[in-house]
Amino acid sequence: MTELKNDRYLRALLRQPVDVTPVWMMRQAGRYLPEYKATRAQAGDFMSLCKNAELACEVTLQPLRRYPLDAAILFSDILTIPDAMGLGLYFEAGEGPRFTAPVTCKADVEKLPIPDPEGELGYVMNAVRTIRRELKGEVPLIGFSGSPWTLATYMVEGGSSKAFTVIKKMMYADPQALHLLLDKLAKSVTLYLNAQIKAGAQSVMIFDTWGGVLTGRDYQQFSLYYMHKIVDGLLRENDGRRVPVTLFTKGGGQWLEAMAETGCDALGLDWTTDIADARRRVGHKVALQGNMDPSMLYAPPARIEDEVATILAGFGQGEGHVFNLGHGIHQDVPPEHAGAFVEAVHRLSAQYHN
């Protein structure tokens, strides 16, 4: 087993005792940091940054040099799998991700390959191995993937969407085609995350960014069912240590009980969910991650500290809380405000761990 100097993040996910509440931030390696912008400029474009193991490692480590974070998260993108399937990922200035060859029908789905994690996606595994080497056991490394439903939204819509009419048309008019796509994606994500674990990821997270746009019944059928399949297929031990799994559905606060039934170790909460209520509902089964509104980081540090105190009090005494934002950090947040946030979590949380 590789020694970890700080394992409180992994311990909290497994609801084991910790000295203070661990904290990390979604998108902690990102555009709010001037050093990230410099490295990205050096890489040329976003996917070139993802595909260069040394540069992906550099941006993964940048926030850890600034802040005493309790975990590193692989610098990558959720759309690596659709890109490896041959959909032609590119980024439009101000528009976000787009695909040159979106999925439009069942025949398109049938043609899609299941990517080899050490082949087309080998650059991700190289980044994982490089980051693990450079972390030198300081903190654990989180691997991740998008959920099948969330990946499918981009693949069918051809990019980002506000109304999701194209994928919902497929869902209601040709559900068989969508299920075929989701099944293929579930197999791909399982292989991809297991390869990340074998390469050195010590915890994995599934981001279901768009599950919250579904009705309750559709969420169960088209999103949660496939995440459950992935959880069932994941390696749960590696290097002599349990590998915790976190599920995060943005807008999924009403479905926490169903999510906790998947066998995952933790649930991510967005900021619209009350953490005290979430703990009452599922805290006996899973750890909870979250859940400060990322926009709170625009506030003065004293106000950020008040919000941290409120969320810590909401979760209350005992184990099973990983502090985080309710979604990714915004790109124009002052870096010193992120620092105040991390410092406040550690300082104010000790009283909850006796």
UniProtKB/Swiss-Prot annotation:
**Top enzyme class of this protein?**
lyase
- Give the EC number(s) listed in the UniProt record: 4.1.1.37
Chief localisation class:
cytoplasm
SUPFAM superfamilies from the xrefs? UROD/MetE-like
Tell me a Gene Ontology molecular-function term this record carries. Answer: uroporphyrinogen decarboxylase activity
Which pathway does this polypeptide act in? Porphyrin-containing compound metabolism; protoporphyrin-IX biosynthesis; coproporphyrinogen-III from 5-aminolevulinate: step 4/4
Which residues take part in binding substrate?
27-31, 77, 154, 209, 327
Say yes or no: keyword Glycoprotein present.
Answer: no
Q: Name one Pfam family in it.
A: URO-D
Where in the cell is the protein located? Cytoplasm
Q: Record's Gene Ontology CC terms? A: cytosol
Gene Ontology annotations of biological process type: protoporphyrinogen IX biosynthetic process from glutamate
The reaction(s) this protein catalyses: uroporphyrinogen III + 4 H(+) = coproporphyrinogen III + 4 CO2
InterPro entries for this protein: UROD/MetE-like_sf, Uroporphyrinogen_deCO2ase_HemE, Uroporphyrinogen_deCOase
Annotated site, Transition state stabilizer, chain positions = 77
**What keywords sit in the KW lines?**
Cytoplasm, Decarboxylase, Lyase, Porphyrin biosynthesis
How this chain assembles, per its entry, is:
Homodimer.
* Protein purpose: Catalyzes the decarboxylation of four acetate groups of uroporphyrinogen-III to yield coproporphyrinogen-III.
Q: Which family does it belong to?
A: Belongs to the uroporphyrinogen decarboxylase family.
Protein name (database record): Uroporphyrinogen decarboxylase
Q: Which gene encodes it?
A: hemE
